[in-house]
Amino acid sequence: KKKEEKQIKKMVERNPMTVDFYKRYQEIIEEYNRGKDEAVIKETFRKLIELVNSFSEEEADTRREGLTDEQKAIFDILRHGKKLEDKEKNEIKKISVELLEDLKQEKLKVDQWADKSVTAAAVFNTVSKTLFETLPYPSYQTDEIDLKTNLVYEHLKHQYFGGGMSVYGQY
């Protein structure tokens, strides 16, 4: 149980779009705690196995997309709730990779960048400008780009600490 919980928390920490895994895990554990008969235990175990297999699918999806965990997190934020054609999906992948590379070159390396208003504004503006200039229209409208800008910025704020450190390691 502790191993799975640790793996789920790590996954959610690295990519907030995987929070559904954690919710499903909690539901399974609650279900287990409600009943202790053999049928409930077997069903709970089956669901736990299914959940662990879905972790593997998420990891395989990351590899299949040709992205790192940190790139996939941005990619997932940008594509969440969208039905994208392959061409658009590839554009979103490219945007995710290039935006992250650009920010990691300088802005995210500033110690405690999120606490410094000028640097934080520069990060936000880079995200906003990049998304407004590159996300495919009409698939992404102005209000959606505003939302995605805020989601990406919040993700960066919580995952990148500055000084070349992030939840993904040193960069």
Positions of PLM-derived features:
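Catalytic cores and motor modules of nucleic-acid processing enzymes
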Residues: K1-Y171
